[in-house]
């Protein structure tokens, strides 16, 4: 699915991979089917810098927490934990920090990962449009 609207929101099918497993796959030391992954319907949030995943998905993928930082979020200033993941939408992938959110929250794809993969949101249709990755 290239993206679709649900009550004014844009969702995509996204695959989040453990970055260490994925690196071993790229190096030919692991089969793709052996890479820890989570296939999720994620909300495309162009107001969010980074993707965000619920804590239970972070744990399932075995993503280590890299740091905890003070950040400006949709709910105000708060401390957030950051992990690292590989994200795939369609045939494109990106490595990105991922914000750890409480269990049960909606997975998000933020603007940095979208730009790394060359996607933009068509506001008229609510669908993702493929273009060139932004490497500015």
Language model: regions and residue ranges:
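Pepsin/retropepsin-fold aspartyl endopeptidases
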Residues: 1-136
């Amino acid at each position: 699915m290239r993206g679709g609207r649900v009550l004014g929101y844009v969702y995509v099918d996204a695959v989040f991979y453990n970055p260490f497993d994925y690196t071993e796959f790229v190096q030919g030391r692991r089969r793709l089917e052996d890479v820890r992954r989570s296939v999720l319907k994620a909300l495309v949030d162009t107001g969010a810098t980074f993707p965000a995943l619920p804590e239970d998905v972070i744990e399932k993928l075995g993503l280590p927490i890299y740091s905890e930082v003070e950040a400006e979020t949709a709910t105000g200033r708060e401390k957030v934990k950051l992990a690292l993941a590989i994200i795939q939408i369609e045939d494109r992938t990106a490595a990105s920090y991922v914000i750890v959110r409480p269990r049960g929250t909606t997975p998000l794809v933020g603007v940095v990962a979208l730009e790394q993969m060359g996607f933009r949101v068509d506001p008229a249709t609510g669908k993702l449009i493929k273009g060139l990755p932004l490497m500015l």
